[in-house]
């Protein structure tokens, strides 16, 4: 049977391909040190696990859950925004639970994109922004993120005709893959831009809790007018080491939240209630869970950056996320350098061109590796003949 065009036109998912490549190498006996996928290596905090165990033992959680999420969970999310950002949210109309934020990101274009419609996507960017638009039959239009503009979209450079036709604009700060942060004035300009052109902003805040060196990332929702023009996705995956739990949310503009919820009622059956109780515990439990996590990534970053710079590779210091976005040495493109390092040392860095055309010339280095393995990686690189200058 021939595949549908939507599958034929869909590129392979970057991280699935990375998994396959690393698995092949391990089968061949390679001791792989992967800085590739942003999957925290630490365990979920004990208080969250214990709440999950308690909830699983309660038979009332074993039935079909609510499509939009338990009221208690949605209320906790709303309270979290109030306490952290001073933003009031209606848990009944402005909050919907998600089976991880990726699910909501993938479903949103189906709410608004008809065949041929335009959505703006950051480049480089999380691949799901582009593929979700393609699956909905839309046309993703790249918005370059370049170092000269601090990896922020230049809103004034977006073609007027494109802006008038665009229906969605995916934004993500702190940013994956660049580790960039967005100042408050950028969000204010973004809201004005969206209001002018009647574009729905979809802000992906998956790394909102991973601010380093005392930096506290803002929320799109905290700015005046944000609820009028868009929504924000977030997840418990990265800050609480819960990538496998699949629990997140979307908040903001009520008609967009309603549309996203309507899609979900026809596709999935919601989040297992025991996981939602664990999510409530994550958002209301000890604050030192976040502090321990950010301290860990700061230490790893400092160790790795210092070691790579000693080798002559001038990598930047990220202020948020657990990613270092590093220029490859002269004479290589992203794939060539990543492959060369992997073949020589068994160390994997993700080639930047996997995140889009404007990711060429970079690699993404995830700090989801223990200090011991970081030291081992630095030693391997030091003993190799790889030129970093």
Curated annotation (Swiss-Prot):
Substrate binds at residues 13, 38, 102, 126, 176, 364. Pyridoxal 5'-phosphate binds at residues 67, 101-102, 126, 176, 207, 235-237, 246. Pathway: Amino-acid biosynthesis; L-lysine biosynthesis via DAP pathway; LL-2,6-diaminopimelate from (S)-tetrahydrodipicolinate (aminotransferase route): step 1/1. It is an enzyme of class 2 (transferase). GO terms for biological process: lysine biosynthetic process via diaminopimelate, diaminopimelate-aminotransferase pathway. One of its GO terms (molecular function) is pyridoxal phosphate binding. Keywords: Aminotransferase, Pyridoxal phosphate, Transferase. The modification N6-(pyridoxal phosphate)lysine is found at residue 238. It catalyses: (2S,6S)-2,6-diaminopimelate + 2-oxoglutarate = (S)-2,3,4,5-tetrahydrodipicolinate + L-glutamate + H2O + H(+). It comes from the Bacteria. Its EC number is 2.6.1.83. Involved in the synthesis of meso-diaminopimelate (m-DAP or DL-DAP), required for both lysine and peptidoglycan biosynthesis. Catalyzes the direct conversion of tetrahydrodipicolinate to LL-diaminopimelate. This is LL-diaminopimelate aminotransferase. The gene is dapL.
């Amino acid at each position: 049977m021939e595949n549908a065009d939507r599958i034929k036109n869909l590129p392979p998912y970057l991280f699935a391909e990375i998994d396959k490549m690393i698995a092949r190498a391990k089968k061949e006996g390679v001791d792989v040190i992967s800085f590739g996928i942003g999957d925290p290596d630490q365990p979920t905090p004990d208080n969250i696990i214990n709440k999950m165990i308690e909830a699983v033992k309660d038979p009332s959680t074993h039935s079909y859950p609510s499509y939009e999420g338990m009221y208690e969970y949605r209320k906790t999310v709303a309270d979290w925004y109030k306490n952290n950002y001073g933003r009031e949210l209606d848990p009944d109309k402005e909050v919907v639970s998600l089976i991880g934020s990726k699910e909501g990101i993938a479903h949103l274009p189906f709410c608004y994109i008809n065949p041929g419609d335009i959505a703006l996507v950051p480049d480089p960017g999380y691949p799901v922004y582009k593929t979700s638009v393609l699956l909905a039959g839309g046309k993703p239009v790249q918005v370059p993120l370049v170092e000269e503009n601090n990896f922020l979209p230049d809103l004034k450079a977006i073609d007027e005709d494109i802006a008038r036709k665009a229906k969605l604009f995916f934004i993500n700060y702190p940013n994956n893959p660049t580790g960039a942060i967005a100042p408050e004035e950028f969000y204010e300009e973004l809201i004005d831009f969206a209001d002018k052109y009647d574009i729905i902003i979809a802000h992906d805040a998956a790394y909102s809790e991973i601010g380093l060196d005392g930096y506290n990332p803002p929320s799109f929702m905290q700015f005046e007018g944000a609820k009028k023009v868009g929504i924000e996705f977030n997840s418990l995956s990265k800050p609480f080491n819960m990538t496998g739990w699949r629990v997140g949310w979307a908040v903001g503009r009520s008609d967009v939240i309603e549309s996203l919820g309507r899609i979900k009622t026809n596709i999935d059956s919601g989040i297992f209630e025991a996981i939602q109780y664990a999510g409530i515990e994550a958002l209301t439990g000890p604050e030192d869970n976040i502090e321990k996590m950010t301290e860990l990534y700061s230490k790893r970053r400092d160790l790795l950056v210092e070691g790579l710079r000693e080798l002559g590779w001038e990598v930047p210091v990220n202020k948020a996320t657990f990613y270092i976005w590093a220029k490859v040495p002269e004479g290589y493109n992203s794939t060539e350098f990543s492959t060369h390092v992997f073949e020589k040392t068994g160390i994997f860095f993700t080639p930047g061109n996997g995140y889009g055309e404007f990711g060429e010339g970079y690699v993404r280095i995830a700090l989801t590796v223990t200090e011991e393995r970081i030291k081992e990686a630095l030693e391997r690189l030091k003993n190799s003949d790889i030129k970093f200058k």
